[in-house]
């Protein structure tokens, strides 16, 4: 009796044999028509083959073999791996970059994940009420919230305690200028001007406490502009106002300007009394023409100052000076605001221009020699010549003396104004 077909199929699969080693069958059997028994055995063998691969370990299903041949268009730019789908490539790239876009939404949990399935698996921990981890996370979240609230309250209380007390309003401020503008209502006397200056500068005397630097500078600027306007209107006209010519450049180079003094006071030693002592024996300038002027003579002001300028020399030439032009705005130098005198100054009558001594530049002096019209009216052309100018005889020592360069000899006892007029 021949073996069953199923046993023949398993034996053939487990022990394959070459066709040459198999015994030859009679020709009549191979040429004989197939019987129903052989068809049944072939169908059983096919079914056994189809059921065998899932049972064998390490074998791939037959339907996954074509998938290995599918294209992988999504390649990782950081490594050599390629993927069939874009989301797989994106998920893989996050392993390189460390990006974790999926954050847990549970309050108090700060965990993040790079994959959505990891977030889903993690969220089950919070959703499970019986989980010990869930209870621990809830306790930690509550403790963190309480600590944050306590920290906010502590910061608020510290800020309130460290805040400085409300500052008191500043009662000492720069007084408002009450001197009217010269264009509107200029003062008409020195007493009126001195009264206004006292009201403006009364609290800023030499020994009084000064306000802050900002108010000091503003007050200095206001006083400087006011003094400049008043001097342009001719209020500083003293009996020796015409003596300024010999020391005009000296005052420009030696007197401390108002702006420079304000800047130096603000930036260097604005609250030191040593500077007051240093200036007290060198510069004690009060307002010009003041009867209580304490200004020393200019030879004691600087070592290289040789001008015999008198003590009460004004700082600007009056507009109606007999021989000299008034100083311009750029040449005007003001005294220190702290050394201005606040005493009343008597009103002085305007000084009339009176020539003192010979004045070679006076236009009223008669001409010496023929005039130009007389020379041009002569009939002879050879006589139409200008005469040789008459130069005043001046000694060489006088020309070389510093008097013509705004600094004269300190040994000279002559008055600056008259001496200069004689030299001209």
UniProtKB/Swiss-Prot annotation:
Its main location: nucleus. GO terms for cellular component: cytoplasm; nucleus. Ubiquitinated. Deubiquitinated by creB, probably to control its activity or amount. Residues 39-50 have a biased composition (Polar residues). GO terms for biological process: regulation of DNA-templated transcription. Gene3D superfamilies: Classic Zinc Finger. SUPFAM superfamilies: beta-beta-alpha zinc fingers. SMART domains: ZnF_C2H2. This is Probable DNA-binding protein creA. PROSITE patterns: ZINC_FINGER_C2H2_1, ZINC_FINGER_C2H2_2. Belongs to the creA/MIG C2H2-type zinc-finger protein family. Transcription regulator component of the regulatory network controlling carbon source utilization through ubiquitination and deubiquitination involving creA, creB, creC, creD and acrB. Represses the transcription of the alcR, alcA and aldA genes by binding to a GC-rich region in their promoter. Also plays a role in response to carbon starvation and the control of extracellular proteases activity. InterPro entries: creA/MIG_C2H2-ZnF (IPR051007), Znf_C2H2_sf (IPR036236), Znf_C2H2_type (IPR013087). GO terms for molecular function: RNA polymerase II cis-regulatory region sequence-specific DNA binding; zinc ion binding. Interacts with creB. A zinc finger (C2H2-type) spans 74-96, 102-126. Residues 62-72, 271-280 have a biased composition (Basic and acidic residues). Keywords: DNA-binding, Metal-binding, Nucleus, Repeat, Repressor, Transcription, Transcription regulation, Ubl conjugation, Zinc, Zinc-finger. Residues 21-38, 288-302, 406-416 have a biased composition (Low complexity). Residues 1-74, 115-134, 161-184, 266-327, 347-386, 403-424 are annotated as: Disordered. It is found in: Nucleus. It holds the Pfam family zf-C2H2. The keyword Zinc applies.
């Amino acid at each position: 009796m021949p073996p069953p077909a199923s046993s023949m199929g398993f034996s053939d699969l487990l022990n394959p044999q070459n066709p040459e080693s198999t015994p030859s069958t009679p020709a009549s059997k191979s040429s004989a028509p197939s019987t129903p028994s052989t068809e049944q055995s072939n169908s059983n063998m096919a079914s056994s083959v189809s059921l065998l691969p899932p049972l064998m370990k390490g074998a791939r299903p037959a339907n996954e073999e074509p998938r290995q041949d599918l294209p992988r268009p999504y390649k990782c730019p950081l490594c050599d791996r390629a993927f069939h789908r874009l989301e797989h490539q994106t998920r893989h790239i996050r392993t390189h970059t460390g990006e974790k876009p999926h954050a847990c939404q549970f309050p108090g949990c700060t965990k993040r994940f790079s994959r959505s399935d990891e977030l889903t698996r993690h969220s089950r921990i919070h959703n499970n009420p019986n989980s010990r981890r869930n209870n621990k996370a809830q306790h930690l979240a509550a403790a963190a919230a309480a600590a944050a609230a306590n920290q906010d309250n502590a910061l608020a209380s510290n800020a309130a305690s460290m805040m400085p007390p409300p500052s008191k309003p500043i009662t000492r401020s720069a007084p408002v200028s009450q001197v009217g503008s010269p264009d509107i209502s200029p003062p008409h006397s020195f007493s009126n001007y001195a009264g206004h200056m006292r009201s403006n500068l009364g609290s800023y005397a030499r020994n009084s406490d000064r306000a802050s630097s900002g108010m000091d500078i503003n007050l200095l600027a206001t006083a400087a502009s006011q003094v400049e306007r008043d001097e342009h209107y001719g209020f500083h006209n003293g009996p020796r106002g015409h003596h300024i010519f010999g020391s005009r450049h000296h005052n420009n180079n030696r007197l401390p300007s108002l702006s420079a003094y304000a800047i130096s006071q603000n930036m260097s030693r604005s609250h030191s009394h040593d500077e007051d002592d240093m200036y007290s024996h060198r510069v004690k300038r009060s307002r010009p023409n003041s009867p209580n002027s304490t200004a020393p003579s200019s030879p004691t002001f600087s070592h290289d100052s040789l001008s015999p300028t008198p003590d009460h020399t004004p700082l600007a030439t009056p507009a109606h000076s007999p021989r000299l032009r008034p100083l311009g705005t750029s040449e005007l130098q003001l005294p220190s605001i702290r050394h201005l005198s606040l005493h009343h100054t008597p009103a002085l009558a305007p000084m009339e221009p009176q020539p003192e001594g010979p004045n070679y530049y006076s236009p009223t002096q008669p001409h010496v020699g023929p005039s130009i019209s007389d020379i041009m009216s002569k009939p002879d052309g050879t006589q139409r010549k200008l005469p040789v100018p008459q130069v005043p005889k001046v000694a060489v020592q006088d020309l070389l003396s510093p008097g013509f360069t705004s600094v004269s000899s300190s040994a000279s006892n002559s008055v600056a104004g008259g001496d200069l007029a004689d030299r001209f």
